Amino acid sequence: IIMTDFEKVKDFILDMGFAISHEDPKEELVVINDDERGIKNFVIDCEAPILILEQVIIPMPEDSSDFCRRLLQINRTLVHGAFVLDEEGTTLLFRDTLQLENLDRNELEGSIDALSLALAEYADELVTFARG
């Protein structure tokens, strides 16, 4: 039996112990949550040839140029992924992309762990900024 990329990704996620809170097989995406690890509505989307991993972090306040500079410095320390802005520049997201073709469980787990580590390390700073 040949598994689709979507089925493979779902298997990896379930194998890691995550609960899938939402699934859209047509769009080939799942949403996972793990409050203890700071994972909330984490979207994992198969967009061949890549897998997109994305989570909303905070809304961006109006004057955020200093914070954007700080985010670029933080990005330099991240093992995987990066803090990015949405197209409108109004929302801060964590985002990572992986190649689907030879994706393995360790690689996917590493990207998810990177989000948890980034939030553990920088959550206070992000919250302080979000409050203005």
Range-by-range predicted roles:
Residues 1-39, 77, 84-86:
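Charge-rich, low-complexity N-terminal segments
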Residues 4-8, 63-67, 107, 111-114, ...:
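Short amphipathic alpha-helical segments
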Residues 9, 67-71, 126:
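Generic structural signal of hydrophobic/aromatic residues within well-ordered alpha-helices
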Residues 27-30, 49-51, 90-92:
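Hydrophobic residues embedded in beta-strands of well-ordered beta-sheets
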Residues 36-38, 59-61, 100-101:
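Short, surface-exposed beta-strand-loop junctions and turns on beta-sheet-rich folds
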Residues 40-58:
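A short acidic-to-branched-hydrophobic micro-motif
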Residues 52-91, 97:
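Short, internal acidic amphipathic alpha-helical interface segments
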Residues 80, 84-113, 117-132:
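Well-ordered alpha/beta subsegment
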